[in-house]
Amino acid sequence: MIGRLRGVLTSKTPPWLVVDVCGVGYELEVPMSTFCELPDVGYEVNLFTHYTQKDDSAALYGFLSESERRLFRHLQRVSGIGTKIALAVLSSVSVDTFAGLIQAGDVNALTVIPGIGKKTAERMLVELRDRAADFNNGISTSGKLNLDTVSEAALALQQLGYKPAEAARMARDAGTESDDVATVIKKALQAALC
């Protein structure tokens, strides 16, 4: 119905924003990964959208990339996963990282994401394994940051008091391909202090 919006960002309060398109203000809910990348109020934005309508409500969701929207749609096809968990996934890990977790069958790393327990993670693996290339644009995840390292570092950061989504983001953003867990944790903590 509404596939994309381009307009001026007029309001920005996590996780909501309003985009003015030719005098009409569209309210969208966005994952935190998208929210953090948005420009300041008053600047133009270009968002891919997903529209949902239930019995008594309608909602519009916004994403910076087509691959984020594609993953959001794939996640909602998994039994027991709705928009809330789909947004939590996109707020916690990148599309490439998520595809790598699915391809690797890493249940433990998936359970770090808020709202995903062991059973939900296992169901995601079963239902999404064959579709990982679809939402990942067929990009191979080899050569990327070691996913076991990311999940271990995220768990350690949680033990230090960080929320699961924040810990996952910190670990993912801080590490490089050759880093061990201790190095990822150290870099994540240094980045948090800056």
UniProtKB/Swiss-Prot annotation:
- The region called Domain II is annotated at 65-140
What residue spans carry the region label Domain III? 145-194
Q: Which GO terms describe its biological process?
A: DNA recombination; DNA repair
Q: Which UniProt keywords apply?
A: Cytoplasm, DNA damage, DNA recombination, DNA repair, DNA-binding
Q: Which GO terms describe its cellular component?
A: cytoplasm; Holliday junction helicase complex; Holliday junction resolvase complex
Q: What is its main location?
A: cytoplasm
- Cited Pfam families: HHH_5, RuvA_C, RuvA_N
> Annotated region Flexible linker: where?
140-144
- Which InterPro entries does the protein's record reference? DNA_helicase_Holl-junc_RuvA_I, Hlx-hairpin-Hlx_DNA-bd_motif, NA-bd_OB-fold, RuvA, RuvA_2-like, RuvA_C, RuvA_C_sf
Which residues lie within the region annotated Domain I? 1-64
HAMAP family found in the cross-reference section: DNA_HJ_migration_RuvA
The protein's assembly and partners: Homotetramer. Forms an RuvA(8)-RuvB(12)-Holliday junction (HJ) complex. HJ DNA is sandwiched between 2 RuvA tetramers; dsDNA enters through RuvA and exits via RuvB. An RuvB hexamer assembles on each DNA strand where it exits the tetramer. Each RuvB hexamer is contacted by two RuvA subunits (via domain III) on 2 adjacent RuvB subunits; this complex drives branch migration. In the full resolvosome a probable DNA-RuvA(4)-RuvB(12)-RuvC(2) complex forms which resolves the HJ.
The name this protein goes by in its record: Holliday junction branch migration complex subunit RuvA
> Per UniProt, what is the name of the gene that codes for the protein in this document?
ruvA
